[in-house]
Amino acid sequence: MRPDDKPHLIDRVLQDNETVTLGGETLIAHRTPGHTPGCTSWELDVEENDRTYTALINCSIGVNPDYQLYQNSDRPDIVADYRYSYGMLRSLDIDIPLGGLGGSHPGMYNLTDKYERIGETPNPFIDPGGYLYEIAINEQAMGLRLEEQRRAAEAGNR
């Protein structure tokens, strides 16, 4: 995205696990390059009723239908990037998962349903199990797509 077709000014290039503070909130950058090179997920602490929870604004972790995983000459590390992202995300202790790419994936973590339940007790957004489940189903889907593409390539070489 280039507003008015002008390049963005870059203050600094963030590395994995570096922090950014905005409006008094500190966010931790996590490199999650599977879906898109340079994709970054953001971890932050949030408070509710005198408790602190860890939230994650996750970059997308799904595989788009047109993605070539097997023997991708344009992105030879795509499978390793996805696997890195899934493993790294699984290693985080997240209470509140939030959808990827700035809310453009409301289906992630059942966010649409949770939004309709705002105000309920317990808070529907506190969902560490849903966080891990979303990682697992996306990782499984990536593995199935990779195997499907591998088989198709091998069948074409016979």
Regions found by a protein language model. Give the residues of each.
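Divalent metal-coordination and catalytic microenvironments
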Residues: L14, T32-H35, W42, L101, ...
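Bulky hydrophobic/aromatic packing residues
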Residues: E25-L27, L44, D50, R158
